[in-house]
Amino acid sequence: MISETNFTNPLFGRILTAMVTPFNENGDVDYELAIKLSNYLFENGSDGIVLCGTTGESPTLSWSEQHDLFTAVKGSLDSSCKVIVGTGSNSTIEAIEATRKAYESGADGALVVVPYYNKPPQEGLYTHFSSIANSAKDLPLMLYNIPGRTGCNLLPDTVKKLMDFSNILSIKAASGRIEEVTELRAACGPELFIYSGDDSLLLPMMSVGAVGVVSVASHLVGTQLREMIFFFLDGEVSKALEIHEKLQPLFKGLFETTNPIPVKAALELLGWKVGSPRNPLTPLNKEQKENLSKIIKNLSL
């Protein structure tokens, strides 16, 4: 049984759902449905909600839409539910402005992604994140390393330097490498809260020190993920592994094509009218939707 304080008392809880952004038939943000969905997620396994991240289609949301979405969702949820807002940008100035606004609006934390496209060196990443940290010193920040989307990898030694800032406390590790957790712990120690950025790697990453997950699958199987986590924490590894293996087809199906296309389709199949993703993302094709439907039926969702 792992007894490190940070492992047993994670900063944002165990399961954070990276929530989709619902759109109505006109393609506008459906704030009322966002309120209903976020409350449903909180009632079904999620400790917190991440808004305006990759799954929330932040690249195609205006800053005003993002602010209005946060205001609507945060105001509707129980205070025990953490609401983290994606405030990252490949412009340091924009990221600072968004993070300050999140803090002033009452966010529980900010998810700040590695700058994308311009591919800064590690020195530039340090400058970027330290400037954001200084701009909202009382707001907990979760760094977001996803090199497959950004084209840039945040190295553990850089994370270690950034931990000199008291509000840089956690990281979403989404490189797809289990070793990332071990490398981060070797550089930063157990003080860093590491969250898996991949549902399929949640259990393996927890076995080497991750504390939880920023999840897509929790839209559909939040209670099952919670059971898996607590079986593992209680030392019932075989039961945790059984759930992990049972859910693998869903984890794979939700990433058959670009996220959040499949999870929006899955929610539609279950009666949540969250709408299609905004262009340039496109809905699932017929064959993909049929495959996803089979997975959902096999899990009796």
UniProtKB/Swiss-Prot annotation:
Keyword Amino-acid biosynthesis among UniProt keywords: yes
Swiss-Prot/TrEMBL site (Part of a proton relay during catalysis) positions: 54, 117
Signal peptide, first to last residue: none
E.C. designation(s): 4.3.3.7
Catalytic activity: L-aspartate 4-semialdehyde + pyruvate = (2S,4S)-4-hydroxy-2,3,4,5-tetrahydrodipicolinate + H2O + H(+)
This protein's encoding gene: dapA
GO biological process per UniProt: diaminopimelate biosynthetic process; lysine biosynthetic process via diaminopimelate
Main location: cytoplasm
Name of the protein in question: 4-hydroxy-tetrahydrodipicolinate synthase
MF GO annotations: 4-hydroxy-tetrahydrodipicolinate synthase activity
Binding partners and assembly: Homotetramer; dimer of dimers.
